[in-house]
């Protein structure tokens, strides 16, 4: 049973920021530290810092020949069972670093020349150079290390969707980077049928089919060697009918000196680190977050139609406020992912003196939300969202309320969502006053605007919010 069904969220995977796991069976997805490291939102940055803190501490112990201390850290990288992700068949039970192969795996890492020589720079590099480590083990190591961040994320998502938590439950060990040690704490946890569950942001999971030793070997190492053999006119050089020389990848694979193995990759990388750098840069520039369609085979057009119907069924006024808030979160998640992620509801700022309805993290690597920083010179680490399920007109107090959330450190961009307005020109003029005064950018969005963007999805237009937000910003700035 999926989380959305178990708790009657009335939301599809497209509307949820987390992977909508089936708690009875593992989903064959993996927490991907490379994707995590590529993301620019605050949650991911903090989780990546924690991951790198553990990695550096662990690897330094090995390089300094302090194997006992390294082994003590490694002991905590057991089989996590809380995420319901991975390769297990049947009920989730973990399928990675068990007691049987733990010692063998640790010895492989400790004795690896890739670790000793410094070729291994990040946790995900273990997969490229060390036998016995693949995507499932990397995913499970990462889950253990960032467990504290996943606990907090789960709490926020449960608060957002009204899912009850159990109090005073042991979190499980996580890496505390401030203290450089493993810690365990009592927390409010999601517990289902007696088992702790951690929700995972969908933007940090993948099928782990890109950052692989095979891809590095076939697309970078062998292509480099092809050029080298041609340059040196080696015995592997053949000629086409027109006399053009060439070297096949097959001949390189069959030659003893460049046959595939992780040891060979480590030796090659030590001699040619620039090729490894090129591989990492290529992955970073071509990697994209997993799409909703990869997680759920539902038709986005049907989801958009469903959201339009739901929006029309919620009456304006206080009674429908919570339903409206949650629907808005779902619609914005559906429209903006993966550029805007990790929604938090009723977030307190300024020591609780002010509250904002919803806060998203800005994770954009291009497009409108990225241009806020680069082109519009507006800090936008967070996207503030105020939802007003009013039947009356939105006026200056609501605008002042949202702009009062803005600061250089938190961001100066927000969306003001309301059901309808009688005079959009006046509302845009009020937002222009805020913009001209240097207090930030505020864009009003009404039901009809959401419906326009959702209809664009139905028509097959990619990222329909790009055109809408750009035009709405222009209407505010040039009013």
Regions found by a protein language model. Give the residues of each.
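Terminal, charged accessory segments of proteins
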Residues: 1-252
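Generic alpha-helix signal with a bias toward terminal, lower-confidence helices
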Residues: 41-43, 150, 157, 166, ...
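Short, mixed-charge, low-aromatic patches
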Residues: 99-111, 281-290, 316-317, 354-361
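Short hydrophobic/aromatic-rich motifs at helix boundaries and adjacent loops
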Residues: 119-123, 300-303, 374-375
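The feature marks a conserved, polyanion-engaging helical scaffold used by nucleic-acid processing enzymes
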Residues: 175-344, 349-352
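Catalytic core segments in nucleotide and nucleic-acid processing enzymes
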Residues: 303-479
């Amino acid at each position: 049973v999926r989380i959305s069904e178990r708790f009657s969220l009335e939301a599809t995977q497209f509307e949820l920021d987390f992977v909508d796991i089936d708690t009875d069976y593992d989903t064959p997805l993996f927490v991907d530290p490379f994707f995590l490291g590529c993301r620019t939102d605050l949650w991911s940055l903090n989780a990546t810092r924690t991951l790198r803190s553990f990695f550096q501490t662990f690897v330094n112990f090995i390089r300094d020949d302090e194997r006992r201390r390294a082994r003590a850290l490694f002991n905590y990288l057991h089989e996590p069972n809380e995420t319901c992700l991975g390769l297990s068949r049947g009920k989730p039970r973990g399928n990675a670093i068990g007691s049987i192969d733990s010692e063998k795996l640790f010895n492989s890492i400790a004795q690896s020349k890739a670790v000793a020589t410094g070729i291994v720079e990040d946790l995900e590099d273990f997969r490229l150079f060390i036998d016995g480590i693949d995507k499932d083990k990397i995913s499970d190591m990462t889950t253990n290390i960032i467990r504290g961040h996943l606990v907090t994320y789960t709490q926020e998502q449960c608060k957002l969707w009204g899912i009850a938590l159990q109090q005073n439950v042991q979190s499980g060990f996580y890496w505390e980077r401030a203290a450089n040690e493993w810690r365990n704490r009592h927390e409010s946890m999601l517990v289902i049928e007696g088992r702790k569950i951690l929700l995972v942001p969908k933007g940090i999971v993948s099928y782990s089919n890109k950052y692989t030793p095979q891809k590095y070997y076939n697309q970078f190492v062998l292509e480099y060697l092809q050029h080298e053999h041609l340059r040196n006119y080696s015995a592997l050089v053949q000629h086409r009918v027109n006399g053009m020389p060439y070297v096949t990848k097959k001949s390189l694979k069959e030659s003893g000196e460049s046959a595939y193995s992780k040891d060979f990759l480590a030796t090659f990388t030590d001699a040619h680190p620039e090729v490894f750098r090129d591989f990492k840069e290529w992955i970073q520039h071509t990697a994209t977050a997993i799409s909703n369609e990869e997680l759920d085979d539902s038709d986005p057009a049907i989801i958009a139609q469903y959201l339009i119907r739901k929006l029309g069924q919620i009456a304006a006024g206080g009674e429908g406020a919570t339903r409206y808030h949650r629907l808005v979160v779902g619609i914005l998640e559906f429209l903006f992912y993966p550029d805007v992620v990790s929604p938090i509801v009723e977030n307190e700022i300024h020591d609780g003196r002010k509250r904002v309805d919803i806060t998203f993290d800005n994770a954009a690597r291009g497009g409108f939300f990225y241009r806020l920083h680069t082109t519009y010179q507006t800090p936008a680490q967070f996207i503030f969202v105020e939802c007003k399920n009013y039947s009356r007109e939105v006026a200056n107090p609501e605008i002042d309320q949202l702009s009062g959330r803005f600061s250089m450190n938190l961001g100066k961009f927000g969306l003001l969502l309301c059901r309808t307005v009688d005079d959009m020109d006046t509302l845009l003029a009020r937002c222009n006053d805020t913009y001209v005064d240097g207090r930030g950018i505020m864009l009003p969005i009404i039901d009809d605007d959401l419906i326009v963007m959702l209809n664009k999805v139905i028509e097959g237009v990619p990222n329909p919010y790009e055109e809408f937000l750009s035009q709405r910003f222009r209407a505010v700035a040039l009013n």
